[in-house]
């Protein structure tokens, strides 16, 4: 090994040793199994906003996480949604929910999860289809997840969501 290669190798080792310790690995079934609570907000480009609290209960059967979400909005309205996340690989899931059109494909990457899905916001006979792009980030201590989502109508961003989950 030449002197040049030894110097490069030394710098590389020094660089690797100065990197921060790895963050907690996100696994949906580990975080959401059992009881979880959350607070969140939804805002649109027109200025409409809405706050909510969520009580969650997750059941894991070794392959599928069933995650019931009981919403209570600041105006008193209540709603319940149930996600079903089927694990399809070490870092992938397929998710379904009552108001989701088709499936949400979920990809985990370290302390983060990424997924997107279509939702029909109009519960009546009309259609108001938007696409959510969610990013979940697990805290270093593994006790909280911050979910930030962008909402698009076609190519246009129309809303955003933030939800803070706590174990």
Where are these regions (language model features)?
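A short, Trp-centered hydrophobic/proline-enriched beta-strand micro-motif
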Residues: 32-40, 147
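Extracellular Ig-like/FN3 beta-sandwich strand-entry sites
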Residues: 33-35, 64, 142
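Glycine-rich, aromatic-bearing surface loops/beta-hairpins
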Residues: 131-167
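Bacterial N-terminal signal peptides
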Residues: 8-18
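Central antiparallel beta-sheet cores of small beta-barrel/beta-sandwich binding domains
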Residues: 39-125, 133-137
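Bacterial N-terminal signal peptides that target proteins for export
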Residues: 1-9
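N-terminal helix-cap/turn-to-beta initiation motif at the start of protein domains
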Residues: 23-35, 135
